[in-house]
């Protein structure tokens, strides 16, 4: 089914139409209205403002952000999902910048190849978002999904994106048919982040295994596996022997840990204690400790919980280990349902255990 959805979404984007992007087919969730930036028009921007009602943003690549001199909005991003907002902008020729015509002017200017940083004023009424390199295979966010679908459609990787709100100002929640009805009413195709993940995994691989060896870790004989990603960053996995009745544990314990400096880790007592508790649990029951070298340079180092969408490399590591069902050892609150688009990686989070 995902093949049909992604084919229809690609064709819609090519034709300048809008689509709705949601997280996962298996659950009702919030959705964003998305179109390719090169097909922006005042009428489409007005439709987003009137019908979708959310914040109109433009998802771009890191390369374009650098070209247009768009630095992060803040140096320490402590929003829930670490959405990579840059400083907001308006076209220099705009008067107020807020009208649909002037927001469209700003967006189209961003899409032109000869545009310079001096063509904009800051702050403004258009909010650029920087997609992570590697797209949804690194971060399963709508920012990355909207850039990825433009790439797949063969158009410039610049997308206009707007959250869809209900008329009463609330977001559509789980079990709410609002987004499906909205799509039907406006003849819009629905695409899931998990669809893009599955599609891209058929053709792409951001990881390669470079070593697999025996090693002693924290006094335990483990299997040490080292992977390297598309950005030449190394990620290390320690496999603790299973202590149960079967040598093939079907639902292994998994602990992800972002690599940071020793001093930074020691200064964060909560994270240090959670790591030690996880290691003791893995020693007792077996499983995998995955050290991810993906910590965001803009993240607030005081946070113990990173972006729950920012687990794409970890998910690909689990796939390479042959894991489908797993139990997560986590120091973060929240439900296991918060982990977006896991089905795209053919993964199932059976249980989440707080440590």
From Swiss-Prot:
Residues the record lists as binding Mg(2+) 1 = 28
Region annotation (GTP cyclohydrolase II-like) maps to: 203-355
Q: Where is D-ribulose 5-phosphate annotated to bind?
A: 27-28, 32, 139-143, 163
Q: How is the cofactor bound?
A: Binds 2 divalent metal cations per subunit. Magnesium or manganese.
Query: Which keywords does this chain's UniProt record carry?
Result: Lyase, Magnesium, Manganese, Metal-binding, Riboflavin biosynthesis
The record, for InterPro entries, names: DHBP_synth_RibB-like_a/b_dom, DHBP_synthase_RibB, GTP_cyclohydro_II, RibA-like_sf
Q: Where is this site: Essential for catalytic activity?
A: 125, 163
Using the UniProt annotation, give all residue ranges assigned to the region (DHBP synthase): 1-202
What range does the record give for the signal peptide? none
Q: For this protein, what is any one GO molecular function term?
A: manganese ion binding
The reaction(s) this protein catalyses: D-ribulose 5-phosphate = (2S)-2-hydroxy-3-oxobutyl phosphate + formate + H(+)
Q: What is its EC number?
A: 4.1.99.12
In which residues is Mg(2+) 2 bound? 28, 142
In UniProt terms, what function does this protein have?
Catalyzes the conversion of D-ribulose 5-phosphate to formate and 3,4-dihydroxy-2-butanone 4-phosphate.
PANTHER family associated with the record? 3,4-DIHYDROXY-2-BUTANONE 4-PHOSPHATE SYNTHASE, GTP CYCLOHYDROLASE II-RELATED
Name of the protein this chain belongs to = 3,4-dihydroxy-2-butanone 4-phosphate synthase
Which organism encodes this protein? Helicobacter hepaticus (strain ATCC 51449 / 3B1)
